[in-house]
């Protein structure tokens, strides 16, 4: 069988086409302190400086060995773009949302004339362009964004779930607004060189909202992004935290190429629950990859591979203190696997 470039290999693997071996990639947060020290680009500055963001993203490939580059490193850029208060984080901690920006439809109306060439959204788009110009012919360029359900929750704050359960009119309005933004943002990423879009939608977890609410308030809005990317022949991967086992069949209806699952999900059960997507994951980022030994990582990797995982990788965002050697052991296991 012919050998493929990493870009070709991931393109084919995400579309269930034959490849020479498993790609070694990560669709969730990739940065670690060891990478920061190696490349000289550090959090929190790398969240808001395109050159530093690209440099740190590049380190996941040049220092660790992932066969792709991915930006950004957090899921707050979108909320900040729409006026939410943000705690900046530090060398080890990602930024977090501390203040919402929308209480009602009037507040939402004020956000509608946005410009993707402003704020941290513009920074991420510029980082995508930098990475694409350097690596786009050889490596997958993964553009990541928060999903519409979780973005709506960030923007609406603590009131979100109450509004959801009481059927307030701000809920569908916010979801329409957020998903339309997601589509525009994803298209801009693709224009700047991204070939794969990761949708990170943690609060749309089956554990939190159940199947009925997921089908009504998450599925159609996630699918809007996926459909737009399919028109551009751009692959999508959806990550939702928690034990999503009972919701995987519904998540598969989004049409994504890959469903990323965390360590709570049984891989064998997961692969039997979906018909269209491949299952991505699901090494425990804390117990295994951060605190485990290379031998324990090899054992956990073998278990996931034997269970039929489509792409072996981190089960959620990489912990910033994860040792490089541990990530490299997982990468070694992925690259040694043939389908």
UniProtKB/Swiss-Prot annotation:
Named cofactor requirement(s): Zn(2+)
GO biological process: methane biosynthetic process from dimethylamine; methylation; one-carbon metabolic process; porphyrin-containing compound biosynthetic process
Annotated signal sequence range: none
List of residues binding Zn(2+): 239, 241, 316
Regulation: Inhibited by EDTA and EGTA.
Listed result of changing residue 226 to A: In strain: NIH
Origin superkingdom: Archaea
InterPro entries: Methanogen_methyltrans (IPR052024), Methylcob_mtaseMtbA (IPR048096), Mtase_MtaA_CmuA (IPR006360), UROD/MetE-like_sf (IPR038071), Uroporphyrinogen_deCOase (IPR000257)
Family recorded in the similarity comment: Belongs to the uroporphyrinogen decarboxylase family. MtbA/MtaA subfamily.
Protein name: Methylcobamide:CoM methyltransferase MtbA
Organism, as annotated: Methanosarcina barkeri
Lineage of producing organism: Archaea, Methanobacteriati, Methanobacteriota, Stenosarchaea group, Methanomicrobia
Gene that this polypeptide is encoded by: mtbA
């Amino acid at each position: 069988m012919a050998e493929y470039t990493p870009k070709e290999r991931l393109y084919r693997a995400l579309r269930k086409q034959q490849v020479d071996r498993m790609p070694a990639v990560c669709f969730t947060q990739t940065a670690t302190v060891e990478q920061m020290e190696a490349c000289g680009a550090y959090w929190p500055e790398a969240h808001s400086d395109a050159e530093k963001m690209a440099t740190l993203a590049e380190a996941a490939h040049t220092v660790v060995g992932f066969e792709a580059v991915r930006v950004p490193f957090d899921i707050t850029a979108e909320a900040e773009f729409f006026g939410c208060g943000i705690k900046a984080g530090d060398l080890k901690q990602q930024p977090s949302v501390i203040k919402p920006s929308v209480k009602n439809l009037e507040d939402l109306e004020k956000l509608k004339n946005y410009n993707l060439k402003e704020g941290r959204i513009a920074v991420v788009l510029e980082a995508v362009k930098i990475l694409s110009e350097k690596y786009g012919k050889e490596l997958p360029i993964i553009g990541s964004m928060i999903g519409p359900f979780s973005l709506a929750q960030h923007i609406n704050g603590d009131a979100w779930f109450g509004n959801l359960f009481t059927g307030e009119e701000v809920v569908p309005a916010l979801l329409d607004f957020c998903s339309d933004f997601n589509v525009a943002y994803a298209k801009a990423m693709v224009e700047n060189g991204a070939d794969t879009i990761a949708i990170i939608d943690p609060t749309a977890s089956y554990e939190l909202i159940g199947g009925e609410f997921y089908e009504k308030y998450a599925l159609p809005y996630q699918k809007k992004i996926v459909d737009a990317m399919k028109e551009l022949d751009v692959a999508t991967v959806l990550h939702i935290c928690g034990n999503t086992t009972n919701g995987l069949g519904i998540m598969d209806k989004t049409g994504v190429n890959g469903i990323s699952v965390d360590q709570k999900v049984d891989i064998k059960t997961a692969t039997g629950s979906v018909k269209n997507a491949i299952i991505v994951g699901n090494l425990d980022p804390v117990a295994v990859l951060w605190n485990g030994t290379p031998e324990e990582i090899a054992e956990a990797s073998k278990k996931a591979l034997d269970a039929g995982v489509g792409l072996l990788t981190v089960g959620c965002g990489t912990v910033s203190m994860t040792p490089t050697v541990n990530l490299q052991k997982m990468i070694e296991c992925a690259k040694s696997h043939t389908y």
